[in-house]
Amino acid sequence: MKSYTKMVAGVVVAACTIFVSACGGGTTSNGEGGSSASGNAANNAALTVTDVQGREVSFDKQPERIILAEGRGVFATSILDKDKPFDKVVARGSDLKTAAPSFYEELEKAVPETKDIPEIGNMAKGDVTVENLLSYNPDVVVMTADHYKASETNGMLTKMDDAGIKYVVTDFRQHPLTNTTKSIELLGKIFDKEDKAEAFNKDWTDTVDRVKETAAKADKKPKTFLWRAAGWNDC
């Protein structure tokens, strides 16, 4: 039973690492908001990234104007820069206040400019317009896999492609064990914070490996249920 208890504890740690790091900077941040050394050297160089959908997106220079289509993307950007999680962000999704009200209140206290970031609506609900996105002159829109699927269905992706709006896809929900590190690596390149992304991914991978090793040694493996998003009816 002790082995099983350790296994469950490890799973919880692995599942929550990204959110804990987002709130406090975790062990991956040195408290400085500067760009990575490698990023500074190539700040004006061309950049090509691959998102979780396997799409390659190229930029003539380092993106400077970024839209977080999901406001909760700040959980991840806080890992890259806990002092300035909205650095380079010109607009964000409207979900942050409603989906994570307690987090939003604390974030607003720690980062006062949070309240000044314009909201674009919710891409998953289809209430975002191309005209609104264009008004912020973005270099790239960061959307989730949920947004990507919804926008593909309702024709928003076609409209964005026609308007020349570049976008990349992240995923921390649908396949977290596969796509968490891919998403952080992607954001590290987009936000020019590759060193912070690499540090977090190492910590994440080490934690997941420990969980797997503990689980493999467990004598009893009863079925468990982890309520990932307490309070949400569709969970």
Listing of model-derived features with the role each one plays in the protein:
Residues 1-11:
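Bacterial N-terminal signal peptides that target proteins for export
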Residues 18-22:
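C-terminal motif of bacterial Sec signal peptides marking the signal peptidase cleavage site
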Residues 24-235:
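N-terminal ligand-binding lobe of clamshell/alpha-beta domains
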